């Protein structure tokens, strides 16, 4: 999230995604100023190439902001960009990278907290990605996450909302990119 949102996040006791030190430190400073501790979930980029701390940098990132008494790591997550595709090779790479980041964090005595990764497609296809929590997405509206996946038998009504872009970046042409 943009740093300008930290006041609202703290006011409404919301738990944001953290993947940049600028945002983390702004959140921590404001929380400390208000006498609060801001809980956050660390986004790990395991290959989606949209948001997140590169999986091999998770420990260094946590250490770089871990001194802050206004911050508390509550959870760690990734997003599987290709869990809905017919082939699973990229999903397997992402899962391996995420598991590696988690293991490195634990080896460094950093508790990853609530671990979550499974989106709608991964819930349907990959129980090994369940971890501590599931993130039901489009399937919650009764829709299949992809044409090759079932979805629910009785689709519910759903609404589309217009939102602002939260991140833009240039990636290699061979990289997989998904929504979050």
PLM regions with names:
Residues 1-14, 18-27, 125:
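N-terminal active-site wall of soluble small-molecule enzyme domains
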Residues 22-33, 37-39, 46-172, 177:
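Active-site loop/helix belt of alpha/beta enzymes
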Residues 15-17, 41, 116:
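Short, conserved beta-strand segments within well-ordered enzyme catalytic domains
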Residues 3-6, 44, 77:
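Generic signal for short, ordered secondary-structure residues
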